[in-house]
C-alpha cells in the first residue's frame, strides 16, 4: 500500500500527465477521478503508470460520443468505476460514488417536478429501439442520475462521497446530495463538474459534512480517514 494521501482529481477532459506526476510525487495511496474523463485511449492505457491506484466516477461528457463511452466503460479499469456503490480502500477509508448529472429529461430536482423515470430500466422500456444504446437508454443518458441511484446509495454507509454534481452549498448544486450525504453518514463530499473550488467551510456545521469542489484539471490531497 502506498502511504501517501488520497489524490482527488477535477475533470481531466483528456489530460493526464499532471495527475500521473502528482500521484507519483505525493506517493498517493489512491487516485480518485471526479468525472468528465474523456480519454482518447482506453483509460487503463492513459493511466498505465498508476492504474492500480485509480478509482473514478463518470461525468456527463463521458457519454458525449461512442469513443468516450468505450474508453471508459470498456477499459480494463471499468471495474474501478464506483458509481452507485461503496469501496473500501486498503487504508480502511470507505468511498461512495455518484457519477453523472441531473437532466430534465429524467429528473432535475431543482425544478421541483416529479421524476420522469425512476431508473434506467424504466427509461429504456419507453425508448424506441432505434434510439437505445447497448439495448438500454440513449447513449447520453448513461450519465444521467436516476432517483433509484440515490435511493440505493442512501442505504449504504461511507466516509467520503464523491459526486460529479455539486451538493447544495454551490450556486448550481443540489440539496438532494446534502440529504444523501447525511443519510450515508459521510464526513466529506468531493465533487467536480463546476470547474471551480469554492470555500464552503462556513456551511460545514449546518450541512453536517465537509464539502470540497475540485476545479478543472485541479488536484486536491486529503488524508485518509482511518
Regions found by a protein language model. Name each.
Residues 8-9, 13-90, 175, 182-183, ...:
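Core catalytic region of metal-dependent phosphoesterases/phosphodiesterases
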Residues 2-3, 18, 86-91, 179, ...:
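Binuclear metal-dependent phosphoesterase catalytic core
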Residues 19-26, 88-89, 149-155, 223-226:
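Short amphipathic alpha-helix with an adjacent loop that forms part of the alpha/beta core around
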Residues 93-165:
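Active-site-proximal loop/helix segment associated with metal-binding centers of metalloenzymes
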Residues 11-13, 36-37, 60-61, 164-165, ...:
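Histidine-centered divalent metal-coordination motifs
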Residues 12, 136-140, 170, 194, ...:
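Catalytic cores of nucleotide-sugar-dependent glycosyltransferases that transfer UDP/GDP/TDP-activated
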Residues 3-13, 92-101, 160-164, 211-214:
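Active-site-proximal beta-strand elements of phosphoester/diester hydrolases
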Residues 28, 158, 163, 177-194:
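Proline-aspartate-enriched helix->loop->beta-strand connector
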